[in-house]
């Protein structure tokens, strides 16, 4: 087929069709530079050259009753990770100060749970109020499934975003988790939206999906209108059901970059984040990825290490990207 129309305003008005998306995902190597430049143009049209730095904090580790196949903290996991109970208010504030020193713009508080307990809501509510009083940080909570009133409590405490990833396509979801459904995740995002929280929701690539499922994920997130969209690449963790790495065997740097390009083109106004696994899978294309995304995670993920801060800083400085600063609006 002929090249699709990749004009930024047009992409904002009408999503790519499945056929156009497959053109991107199945493009030959010689087309990759032009596709990457198109994605970069989209990013710069809507956001300029800004890059937002995001820091994660696992406020409790392990002991999750859910059975997500990718997760080292799940009920099915035998992974050798640190397991600890809910951090104290003082520990959370110390880590917020560290995030501020690292030039982070957003601080994400994460707990592996089916949903937040009253104790978790109280502790993180206190933390949010204290952080907002001291640091110019955007705040995001990721605490599992939300019941009535929980999103409102988080919003009132000062949280700006709620993260709840869709992770994969609906047709593949039963392979990934059985203790909750894809629809449960959609309901949680709906509750967060109704409470006035901005939505952070994304995917984990490398869990057995094909090109059509990648398109399905990117289109679903567009239809939800998510403000923040993390694209993760599976880090197989020994001791988890996906720990043997069989599902990522074909995830080459070219395929990883083309997937990121598609998420950019289908979600031109979303804050796209190159998330877990970018260091491993993007390889020589990581500089291109930095130019087409809005944000990156700093210094690792929930249970896995990431890129050193100094390395990432050298990369964004070499690309002349503008790191976001200032009080959150």
Curated annotation (Swiss-Prot):
SMART domains: BATS (SM00876), Elp3 (SM00729). InterPro entries: Aldolase_TIM, BATS_dom, Biotin_synth/BioAB, Biotin_synthase, Elp3/MiaA/NifB-like_rSAM, rSAM. CDD domains: Radical_SAM. Its cofactor is [4Fe-4S] cluster; [2Fe-2S] cluster. One of its GO terms (molecular function) is iron ion binding. [4Fe-4S] cluster binds at residues 64, 68, 71. [2Fe-2S] cluster binds at residues 108, 140, 200, 273. Binds 1 [4Fe-4S] cluster. The cluster is coordinated with 3 cysteines and an exchangeable S-adenosyl-L-methionine. Binds 1 [2Fe-2S] cluster. The cluster is coordinated with 3 cysteines and 1 arginine. Catalyzes the conversion of dethiobiotin (DTB) to biotin by the insertion of a sulfur atom into dethiobiotin via a radical-based mechanism. Homodimer. PANTHER family: BIOTIN SYNTHASE (PTHR22976), BIOTIN SYNTHASE, MITOCHONDRIAL (PTHR22976:SF2). This is Biotin synthase. It comes from Thermus thermophilus (strain ATCC 27634 / DSM 579 / HB8).
């Amino acid at each position: 087929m002929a090249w699709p129309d990749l004009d930024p305003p047009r992409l904002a008005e009408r999503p790519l069709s499945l056929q156009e998306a497959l053109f991107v995902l199945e493009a030959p190597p010689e087309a990759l530079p032009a596709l990457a430049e198109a994605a970069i143009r989209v990013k710069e049209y809507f956001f300029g050259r800004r890059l937002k730095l995001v820091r994660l904090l696992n406020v409790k580790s392990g002991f999750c009753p859910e059975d997500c196949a990718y997760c080292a903290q799940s009920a099915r996991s035998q992974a050798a990770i640190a397991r600890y109970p809910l951090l104290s208010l003082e520990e959370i504030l110390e880590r917020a100060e560290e995030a501020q020193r690292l030039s982070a713009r957003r601080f994400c508080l994460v707990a592996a749970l089916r949903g937040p307990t009253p104790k978790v809501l109280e502790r993180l509510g206190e933390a949010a109020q204290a952080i907002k009083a001291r640091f110019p940080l955007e705040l995001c909570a990721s605490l599992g499934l939300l019941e009535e009133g929980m999103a409102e409590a988080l919003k009132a405490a000062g949280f700006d975003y709620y993260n709840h990833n869709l992770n994969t396509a609906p047709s593949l979801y039963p392979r990934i988790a059985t203790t909750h459904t894809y629809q449960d995740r959609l309901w949680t995002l709906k509750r967060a939206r109704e409470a006035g929280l901005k939505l952070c929701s994304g995917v984990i690539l490398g869990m057995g999906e094909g090109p059509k499922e990648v398109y399905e994920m990117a289109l679903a997130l567009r239809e939800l209108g998510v403000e923040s969209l993390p694209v993760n690449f599976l880090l197989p963790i020994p001791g988890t059901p996906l720990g043997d790495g069989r599902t990522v065997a074909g995830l080459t740097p070219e395929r990883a970059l083309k997937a990121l390009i598609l998420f950019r083109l289908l979600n031109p106004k979303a804050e796209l984040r190159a998330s877990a696994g970018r260091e491993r899978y993007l390889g020589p294309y990581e500089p291109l990825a930095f130019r087409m995304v809005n944000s990156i995670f700093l210094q690792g993920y929930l249970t896995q290490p990431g890129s050193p801060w100094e390395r990432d800083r050298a990369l964004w400085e070499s690309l002349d990207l503008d790191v976001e600063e200032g009080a959150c609006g």
